[in-house]
Each structure stands twice: as structure tokens, then as C-alpha cells.
């Protein structure tokens, strides 16, 4: 979450008059994250999150995100619910941006995830995958293989300013992933596609909610697993923590077992997930709007992660025995 667009108090008051949310007591911008402008609202009827959708989020995708949250909540996934106004609509406009209000979830995101957190995420992700199986609306993943080259092209001329040799490193990896090795026949469904630790809330070691579905789409379920290996199973020094990975994969597998083909593809999917976040971080790093209340994330973190995945030979390196759980 972040703030790119400021909202004046009188604009917000007019906006809230379209809802039955009580009187506004206070509001403040939320600085975390990099995609949209988010505000925490306190009213006489409770706390809510206001999101103004920016940058990569297309307005015609927003009904998908809002309907997905409603569907998942109705199928047992603890996630925010879109709030409808008096006219029955959840999506409207504020400060020239598409905007929506969602319910506030209790909990905090873990700054230092442990193995118990990773297990909670594994179980929660698997339950989300199962709950989304009969969701009728589809949205293609714009940030899969075909979307990586345009991101590279947008940043290539300045990539070596971030790290010497980065442009050539990225080009070589993109050439490999586009050479026909990317899987095409794995189980697909609705994926979160951005399940980092700041998008998962916990109360203690128990997962209390999953948030921020603005990258959700239809893609290989195992790709979502690979994203989480990148997001949850490395230490601050970027070394891979096999204990966390084992906890995550085992917990996922107890709810939804990975197929042999999914297991075999994990190293390749993890490489793809790593370069996807490396590229979007690189573009963001080079293009932060002046004065934005935002902290760009370090793209070089994902250079180190990608190099690790390039060295992986099988799922054993992730703590999982092929076609079976590790005790």
C-alpha cells in the first residue's frame, strides 16, 4: 500500500456521503507498498480502507478484484469485503481515480516471518486456491512471460545504473524463459500473485486475513506457490531458509497436494517469479514520482534470489521430497 494521490478533506466528505458508514472521525495515508493510494478511515461505524487505484491497475479489471474478494469471503477465506454505497455500487471515483472502500481486517503483517507464519501462509494459499475454483470471472495474468519483455524494455537503458551488468543478466534470463521451457499444462485457477508478508495479517502465529488482490488473475496455481517461496522463504541476507520452505510447502500440500508435474516445475516457476518481481521493482526504482509517500523496494534483492533458483536442481532443494511430504 502507498499514497500517490492526496485526498482533500472536503472531497472525502462528499465521497463518504454516498455510503452509510457514519461520521468520519479521522483518516490517514498508508505508506507501505508501491501500487495504489490507500487510506485508513475511522468513522463512527468502524474502521475501513479506502483505495484509489493507480498505475498498472486498469479500471476495467476492478470489477474482477471486487467480485473475487466477495466470492472468496463467501467461501471461507478471510479477506476484506468491498463496501457498497447506497446505490448498491462498490466502485466509484475520487480525486480523478477509481476508488473503493473495503472492510478493515484485524491483525498485523509479520516483519520477521518464522516457520509457523510460513505454514499459515501455505495453508491459507491452498484454501484460497480451492475457494477460487468455481469463480466465474477470468482475468489473464498481464505480468507473466509475455509481459516481462516490455518491463525489461522500459528499464533496460538504465539498468546498469542500478548494478553493472544487470541489463545483460536480465536479457539472458528472459531469453531462456521465452525459449519454450515455460510450463503450459499445469493446473490453473485464480491466484493471488502478490502474497508477500505485507499482504497477510496474523494474530500471533495464526493467519487472520489475506489482503490486496490487485494482481489476482488466472494462472498456474503452482506459480503462486513459487511466488511465495520467493516472498517468504529467504532471510534478510537473501539466503534461502529450507526450514521455512518445508513448513510452507507441507502446509500447502496438506490442503491441496501438488502434482508431480507441479513439483518438477517449481524451480523454473520460481525463476519466473523472481524475474517478474525483479523487473517491476526495477521499473518502480527508476520511476518514483517526485514527492510520493512511497518507499521503493530494492530490485537487487531479486537478483540474489534469482541466482539461487538458477542453482536449484529439484524440489529437494526447497525441502520437499518429490511426490511426498517431508516430516
UniProtKB/Swiss-Prot annotation:
Alphabetic keyword roster: Amino-acid biosynthesis, ATP-binding, Kinase, Nucleotide-binding, Threonine biosynthesis, Transferase
This protein's record includes keyword Transcription regulation: no
Gene Ontology terms for molecular function: ATP binding; homoserine kinase activity
EC number: 2.7.1.39
One example of a Gene Ontology biological process annotation: threonine biosynthetic process
EC class (word): transferase
InterPro entries assigned to the protein according to its UniProt record, in alphabetical order: Aminoglycoside_PTrfase (IPR002575), Homoserine_kinase_II (IPR005280), Kinase-like_dom_sf (IPR011009), Pseudomonas-type_ThrB (IPR050249)
Reaction equations catalysed: L-homoserine + ATP = O-phospho-L-homoserine + ADP + H(+)
Pathway of action: Amino-acid biosynthesis; L-threonine biosynthesis; L-threonine from L-aspartate: step 4/5
HAMAP family associated with the record: Homoser_kinase_2
Family designation: Belongs to the pseudomonas-type ThrB family.
PANTHER family: AMINOGLYCOSIDE PHOSPHOTRANSFERASE DOMAIN-CONTAINING PROTEIN, AMINOGLYCOSIDE PHOSPHOTRANSFERASE DOMAIN-CONTAINING PROTEIN-RELATED
Protein name (record): Homoserine kinase
Taxonomy of the source species: Bacteria, Pseudomonadati, Pseudomonadota, Alphaproteobacteria, Hyphomicrobiales
Amino acid at each position: 500500500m502507498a499514497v500517490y494521490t492526496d485526498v482533500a478533506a472536503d472531497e472525502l466528505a462528499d465521497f463518504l456521503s454516498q455510503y452509510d458508514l457514519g461520521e468520519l472521525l479521522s483518516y490517514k495515508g498508508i505508506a507501505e507498498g508501491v501500487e495504489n493510494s490507500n487510506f485508513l478511515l475511522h468513522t463512527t461505524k468502524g474502521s475501513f480502507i479506502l483505495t484509489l487505484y493507480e498505475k498498472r491497475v486498469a479500471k476495467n479489471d476492478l470489477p474482477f478484484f471486487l467480485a473475487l474478494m466477495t466470492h472468496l469471503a463467501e467461501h471461507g477465506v478471510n479477506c476484506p469485503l468491498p463496501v457498497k454505497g447506497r446505490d448498491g455500487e462498490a466502485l466509484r471515483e475520487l480525486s480523478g481515480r477509481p476508488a473503493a472502500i473495503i472492510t478493515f481486517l484485524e491483525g498485523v503483517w509479520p516483519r520477521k516471518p518464522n516457520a509457523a507464519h510460513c505454514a499459515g501462509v501455505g495453508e491459507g494459499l491452498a484454501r484460497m486456491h480451492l475457494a477460487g475454483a468455481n469463480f466465474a470471472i477470468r482475468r489473464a495474468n498481464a505480468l507473466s512471460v509475455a509481459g516481462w519483455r516490455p518491463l525489461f524494455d522500459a528499464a533496460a537503458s538504465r539498468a546498469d545504473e542500478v548494478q553493472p551488468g544487470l541489463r545483460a543478466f536480465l536479457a539472458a534470463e528472459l531469453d531462456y524463459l521465452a525459449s519454450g521451457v515455460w510450463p503450459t499444462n499445469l493446473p490453473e485457477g485464480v491466484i493471488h500473485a502478490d502474497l508477500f508478508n505485507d499482504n497477510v495479517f496474523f494474530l500471533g502465529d495464526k493467519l487472520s486475513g489475506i489482503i490486496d488482490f490487485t494482481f489476482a488473475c488466472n494462472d498456474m496455481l503452482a506459480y503462486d506457490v513459487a511466488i511465495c517461496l520467493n516472498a517468504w522463504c529467504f532471510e534478510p541476507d537473501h539466503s534461502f531458509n529450507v526450514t521455512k520452505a518445508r513448513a510452507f510447502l507441507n502446509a500447502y500440500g496438506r490442503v491441496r497436494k501438488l502434482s508431480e508435474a507441479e513439483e518438477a516445475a517449481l524451480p523454473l516457476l520460481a525463476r519466473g517469479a523472481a524475474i517478474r518481481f525483479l523487473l517491476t521493482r526495477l521499473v518502480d526504482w527508476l520511476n518514483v514520482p517526485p514527492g510520493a509517500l512511497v518507499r521503493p523496494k530494492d530490485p537487487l534483492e531479486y537478483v540474489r534470489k534469482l541466482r539461487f533458483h538458477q542453482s536449484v536442481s529439484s524440489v529437494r532443494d526447497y525441502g520437499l521430497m518429490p511426490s511426498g511430504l517431508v516430516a
